[in-house]
């Protein structure tokens, strides 16, 4: 541990001189270079439906595996009618077809999809990045990238390990890189996923630049009886994120860190003042008086959304993250953290008005930050056709019954602790899981096919969305740490990182917060409340069958788990996960 920290300090000293020199050339940027967000009129751009790519072939009516070639390109994108075109990094089958977000990949249960992800990015990044947080740093320049299919259950070599990065033309590759083509088995439960960059220390800037896209796994035999809305018009992914812009249209990211003598550029959270849906700022969508299905993905770096409709219309939740619920849940609002997915049906026939705004009222940072304003409190507008029509879609009483969260089946209990460290000025410097940097030897070694209880102890003031690669989990309970003696417990944990020795049972006796009804299904991300212990039941096997994985989950480079606030993930809030047999 000591030697790891020493190596980090040496590297920091070496790169600090370079970073500070670069900062001198950028820190003179004036506020008047920023685009005045109030000048952008809302609801003037139509909601795009992103291009579709199909991860399967149909030959004489028989569905067969397919291979896709998807590139990452430097291009320009119009986020708003009145905003100059923005330099971005975008996924697509060619530069001219690249989009932000990238194309939606449609796949079929049980049919393999092979994707060769190709890096066509330039030598230099379009955004500032911080060399002191140990990012992937190629010797010959270029922008490291690697794609992670978020929510996917597949072999480690196709998981998009942060150290499996590569530069343009595969000229340079990271220490964990193994192959050019990734294999997605598509043998898990049907549901929603998304793909995004996952390069070490660069995830936050690569996603800000535009490297995100939706991925849908369909199982027609299972899903058809539900009679949910189908077809491109009525079944739409909505990828939502926030950005700020300069007057020239370029993405604005603060180039000065909150602790510039430690991290010249890194800041604990990025928040933009413009809300983007499918690549357009506050778009509009003309809808008919009938049911629509929206697969909503929060692709923000750090912003939580608490969605609601301005006229009180209901959400009917049918899925959470990559799995269906056991039955639909009706709700007036939905809290979605970065990287979470919610699958909803909205019945516009029941709308009392001709127009309705999808709005947001989540403070930022969540939960105790600033309240929303006029700009980030609105997401998009729906304009409803006044003519009624026959709607054959239904809301089924039941969906898919997966196994319950039976804690008695767990083979062991692990304690996972979240820490934030601050400077003398009380500004965050870095965040750790279990008090360990990412490079420290693996400590979580679940056995394939088993279930574990994880007691996640959040000792910070932020809500951290915990994402576990490969595993699926159910949230069992959320218990507040007692305020009396909390500082004593934090001090003990900071020194020892041993929940049992620090008498967790003595402090985890506060108020219990019920798990929201639409979040009681199987998830791969969940919001860890500050000052709470959240018990989750993690399953390292399929939930829809007792069959074993069709791949070897013990291969290198293994998997990871981490906070999905990207600015935290990039600054050490990630740990390796090694599955054993």
Curated annotation (Swiss-Prot):
Q: Which CDD domains match?
A: CuRO_1_BOD_CotA_like, CuRO_2_CotA_like, CuRO_3_CotA_like
Q: Which Gene3D superfamilies match?
A: Cupredoxins - blue copper proteins (2.60.40.420)
Location comes to: Endoplasmic reticulum membrane
Query: Is Membrane one of the keywords?
Result: yes
Per the record, GO CC terms? Answer: endoplasmic reticulum; endoplasmic reticulum membrane
**Where on this chain does Cu cation 3 bind?**
198, 469, 562
Record-level Gene Ontology MF annotations = copper ion binding; oxidoreductase activity, acting on diphenols and related substances as donors, oxygen as acceptor
Please list the residue ranges annotated as the Plastocyanin-like domain: 283-352
- Annotated Cu cation 4 binding lies at 464, 563, 568, 573
Say what happens when this gene is deleted: No visible phenotype under normal growth conditions, but mutant plants have reduced inhibition of primary root growth in low inorganic phosphate conditions.
Q: Tell me its cofactors.
A: Cu cation
Q: Which Pfam families match?
A: Cu-oxidase, Cu-oxidase_2
Write the record's keywords in alphabetical order, separated by commas. Answer: Copper, Endoplasmic reticulum, Glycoprotein, Membrane, Metal-binding, Oxidoreductase, Signal
Q: For this UniProt entry, which residues form the secretion signal?
A: 1-28
Against InterPro entries, the record matches this protein to:
Cu-oxidase_2nd, Cu-oxidase_C, Cupredoxin, LPR1/LPR2
Q: How is the cofactor bound?
A: Binds 4 Cu cations per monomer. The Cu cations are bound as 3 distinct Cu centers known as type 1 or blue, type 2 or normal, and type 3 or coupled binuclear.
Which residues, renumbered to this chain, are glycosylated?
254, 298, 386, 458, 546
Q: How does it sit in the membrane?
A: Peripheral membrane protein
Q: Which GO terms describe its biological process?
A: cellular response to phosphate starvation; meristem maintenance
Q: What domain of life is recorded for the organism? A: Eukaryota
Give the EC number(s) under which this enzyme is classified: 1.-.-.-
Known role: Multicopper oxidase that may be involved in copper homeostasis and oxidative stress response, and that is necessary for root growth inhibition by low phosphate conditions. Functions together with LPR2 and PDR2 in a common pathway that adjusts root meristem activity to phosphate availability. Oxidizes the substrate 2,2'-azinobis-(3-ethylbenzthiazoline-6-sulphonate) in vitro.
**Assigned protein family:** Belongs to the multicopper oxidase family.
Name of the protein this chain belongs to: Multicopper oxidase LPR1
User: What lineage, starting at the top, does this entry show?
Assistant: Eukaryota, Viridiplantae, Streptophyta, Embryophyta, Tracheophyta
């Amino acid at each position: 541990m000591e030697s790891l920290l020493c190596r980090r300090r040496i590297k920091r000293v070496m790169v600090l001189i370079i970073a500070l020199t670069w900062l001198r050339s950028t820190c003179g940027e004036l506020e008047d270079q920023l685009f005045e967000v109030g000048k952008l009129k809302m609801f003037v751009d139509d909601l795009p439906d992103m291009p579709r790519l199909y991860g399967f072939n149909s030959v004489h009516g028989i569905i067969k595996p397919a291979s896709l070639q998807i590139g990452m390109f430097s291009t320009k994108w119009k986020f708003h009618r009145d905003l100059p075109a923005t330099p971005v990094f975008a996924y697509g089958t060619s530069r001219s077809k690249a989009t932000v977000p990238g194309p939606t990949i449609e796949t079929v249960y049980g049919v393999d999809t092979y994707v060769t992800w190709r890096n066509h990015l330039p030598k230099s990044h379009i955004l500032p990045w911080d060399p002191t947080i140990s990012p992937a740093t190629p010797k010959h320049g270029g922008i490291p990238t690697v794609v992670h299919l978020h929510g996917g259950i597949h072999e480690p070599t196709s998981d998009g390990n942060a150290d499996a990065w590569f530069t343009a033309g595969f000229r340079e590759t990271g220490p964990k890189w193994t192959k050019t083509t990734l294999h997605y088995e598509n043998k898990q439960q049907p549901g929603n996923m998304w793909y995004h960059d996952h390069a070490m220390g660069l995830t936050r800037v690569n996603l800000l630049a535009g490297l995100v896209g939706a991925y849908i796994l369909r199982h027609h035999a299972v899903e058809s009886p539900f009679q949910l809305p189908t077809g491109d018009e009525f079944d739409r992914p909505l990828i939502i994120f926030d950005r700020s812009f300069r007057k020239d249209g370029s993405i604005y990211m603060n180039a000065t860190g909150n602790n510039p003598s430690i991290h010249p550029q890194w800041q604990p959270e990025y928040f933009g003042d413009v809300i983007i849906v499918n690549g357009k700022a506050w778009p509009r969508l003309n809808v008919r008086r009938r049911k629509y299905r929206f697969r909503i993905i929060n692709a923000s770096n750090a912003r939580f959304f608490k969605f609601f409709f301005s006229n009180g219309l209901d959400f009917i939740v049918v899925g959470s993250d990559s799995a269906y619920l056991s039955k639909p849940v009706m709700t007036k609002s939905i809290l979605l953290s970065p990287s979470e997915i919610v699958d909803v049906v909205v019945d516009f026939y029941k709308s009392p008005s001709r127009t309705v705004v999808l709005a947001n009222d989540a403070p930022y940072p969540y939960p105790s930050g600033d309240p929303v304003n006029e700009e980030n409190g609105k997401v998009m507008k729906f304009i409803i056709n006044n003519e009624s029509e026959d709607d054959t879609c239904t809301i089924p009483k039941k969906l898919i019954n997966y196994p319950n969260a039976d804690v008695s089946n767990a083979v062991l209990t692990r304690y996972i602790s979240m820490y934030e460290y601050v400077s003398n000025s009380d500004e965050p410097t870095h965040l750790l899981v279990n008090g360990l940097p990412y490079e420290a030897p693996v400590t979580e070694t679940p056995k394939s096919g088993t279930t574990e209880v994880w007691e996640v102890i959040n000792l910070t003031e932020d809500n951290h969305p915990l994402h576990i690669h490969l595993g699926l989990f159910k949230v069992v309970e959320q218990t507040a740490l007692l305020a009396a003696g909390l500082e004593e417990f934090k001090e003990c944990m900071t020194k020892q990182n041993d929940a049992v020795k620090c008498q967790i049972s003595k402090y985890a006796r506060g108020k219990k917060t019920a798990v929201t009804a639409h979040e009681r299904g199987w998830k791969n991300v969940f919001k860890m409340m500050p000052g709470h212990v959240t018990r989750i039941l993690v399953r390292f096997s399929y939930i829809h069958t007792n069959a074993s994985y069709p791949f070897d989950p013990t291969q290198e480079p293994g998997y990871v788990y981490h906070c999905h606030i990207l600015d935290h993930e990039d600054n050490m809030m990630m740990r390796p996960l090694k599955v054993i047999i």
